[in-house]
Design a protein with these regions (language model features):
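S-adenosylmethionine
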Residues: 1-211
């Protein structure tokens, strides 16, 4: 039986390490068909909760681990916190995969981190914007804008019940211009998020791709 962290790791390594689009990374990665639904759920879940998972790692790790280990920890934490998998199973598989990937030197750290992690001991930042950003894995710049426009309580309700968003990467600033009226800027160059984006002829012309 394949290690349940292996396929998600292969995909997320391409996203975090190479900057690949998620859909492209999934398409390029051989995934055991029997595990496809689980793998896709994990990779989307990790990316959707990236800010929160990063905060979990920073809160319990004495120093920031290198990217391969950080990806492993994010997958493991997602399985623990959002899929309610058994801690011993997740820990054992994370350690085994680290060794398989040639990261055996980090196996002890991964083991200790996952056994010690306790979500109930997490302390959110005291700053309101930062706290909401972590809690809902929402970019701080977007939280700040929502709070300014709607106030803290209503902004939190919006983040709590936010609809799924589509992330679009444009080939250039000029290509993005016609779409900006309904777009929300992200920290990444020429990448915008939309609550309702419909593909048009611009996709076929290479003006944008989906993240």
């Amino acid at each position: 039986m394949t290690n349940p962290l292996y396929d998600p790791y292969q995909i997320l390594q391409k996203v975090y390490g190479r900057g690949s689009f998620l859909k492209q990374a999934i398409a390029e990665t051989f995934i055991e068909e029997i595990n496809r639904a689980r793998t896709v759920k994990i990779v989307y879940g990790v990316l959707e909760n990236d800010i929160y998972l990063d905060f979990c790692i920073r809160s319990f790790a004495p120093k920031n681990p290198k990217l391969p280990v950080r990806i492993l920890l994010k997958i493991a934490l997602y399985m623990l916190l959002f899929m309610e998998k058994q801690r011993y199973m997740v820990t054992d598989n994370a350690v085994a995969l680290a060794k398989k990937l040639g990261k055996g030197g980090a196996a002890g750290f991964i083991n200790a981190f996952l056994r010690a992690f306790d979500a109930e001991k997490l302390q959110l930042p005291q700053d309101k914007i930062s706290a909401l950003s972590v809690k809902y894995s929402y970019p701080a710049f977007a939280v700040s804008r929502l709070v300014k426009e709607y106030g803290g309580e209503e902004a939190e309700q919006i983040m709590q019940h936010r609809p799924p968003r589509t992330f679009v990467r444009f080939a250039s600033a000029e290509a993005a211009e016609p779409y900006l009226q309904s777009a929300e800027k992200t920290p990444f160059e020429n990448v915008y998020s939309f609550s309702n984006f419909r593909r048009d002829e611009g996709f076929g012309e290479g003006k944008y791709t989906f993240q």
